[in-house]
Curated annotation (Swiss-Prot):
EC supergroup of this enzyme: transferase
Superkingdom of the organism of origin: Bacteria
Official protein name in the record: Glycerol kinase
EC number(s) per entry: 2.7.1.30
Binding residues annotated for ATP, in chain numbering: T13, T14, S15, T267, G310, Q314, G411
Annotated GO CC locations: cytosol
Pathway info: Polyol metabolism; glycerol degradation via glycerol kinase pathway; sn-glycerol 3-phosphate from glycerol: step 1/1
Chain's gene name: glpK
Matching Pfam families: FGGY_C, FGGY_N
Amino acid sequence: MTKKYILALDQGTTSSRAILFNEAGEIIGIEQKEFQQIFPKPGWVEHDANEIWASVLSVIAGVLLKTNVEAKEIAAIGITNQRETAVVWEKESGRPIYNALVWQSRQTAGICERLRAEGFSEMVTEKTGLLIDPYFSGTKVRWILDHVDGAQERAERGELLFGTIDTWLIWKLSGGKAHVTDYSNASRTLLYNIYEQCWDDELLKMLNVPRAMLPDVRPSSEVYAETVSYHFFGEEIPIAGAAGDQQAALFGQACFEKGMAKNTYGTGCFMLMNTGNQGVKSKHGLLTTIAWGLDGKVEYALEGSIFVAGSAIQWLRDGLRMMKSAKESEGYATKVTSADGVYVVPAFVGLGTPYWDSDVRGAVFGLTRGTSKEHFIRATLESLAYQTKDVLQAMEADSGISLKTLRVDGGAVANNFLMQFQSDLLGVSVERPTVQETTALGAAYLAGLAVGFWTSKEEITNNWNLEQKFSAEMEETDRAKLYEGWQKAVRAAQAFK
């Protein structure tokens, strides 16, 4: 029987998904399962790593059943994951010693404050391209070792293992044979030197994390291990690709050339620009990260994070009850010709790139007696585009590259009004692909390349199909005036603390 499919496991923040792709990069089937979010205290977010594993097994079985595909028809498995989320488990039993600490969780804020006070900020950014922030894995590992009795000593003796979610899943699928991560996930831990490509002694010492816990760092496209047959319907299938979700989306969007960029419009927005084999050190509040390791080379990216995007539309729907479904936002927005001077700054949890202001809160400016629900909804949608322009300006300033085209994916890209406004505001074309599951597709491509299912990046580029292109129609003067209003609104929101 021929190997016809690649299985992508997309392990996200609220659900796990299994997606089958064929050789053309088309979706054959999807299965999804949500799992529990654990909030022990305000600002803390945890997951049960065993429940994540159970959800992954469930969606693998579900997608094979739904599509009538047999396990032996799968050429390889690729994994993409919510990044930074940290798991610590016992090497012998495979039992996690504590819940996984999720990327969103702020429970390590105290550790971060101490590190900043001790003057580590510059060294950390210099080596990792990141900031000292609870977002990244390193302080999460420290927290678990501090809060579980005897964990530090056990870790030093080599009895405990640490991994991001990709590492946990590869370890489980391989029956404990492979304790590995890829370059892209390692680059999000705060423990990895992205320029020398190694776990860094100075960073490990800063957080007192024992080297014995750490996974091997491997290329993003390589056979790491095979599934143990009892976890995979009697088959030993190569586990052959891994990348963090945003890097996988960059790969799935075929952004292989230096200067190509994608923006994912999900709960938040994540914009990544490929900077080639040079890590660009940001002076404008961006993160420098590894995009992937492939063919013996590491490629880098600049990343901008917008905390609130699609969740602002959910707020209109659930919090303000302005509409019944997020889809309706487009209809409301197009009933008016402009937002009539209204600006929504959706800083519900602070502002990300380029401001990194965690104290600012949401604000609305420019309301008059004539402001309608339609204006309000339109202004909220426009805020996603304004925040994206903030990030793009920082990227262009850091990289010296002028973007010509932005490739987009994520739930909110179905909104044609938003995509057109985004193009108008940036003054560049916005391209929406036919296959919008680009994160899973990226993981599938990485795995497929490792086993010869696809042979080159050129083949993948040829698979990329345009569904719709949005071209800028706005006059430069109008664009500048609108954006100036946004900048004024952000400054005013920041002043109100």
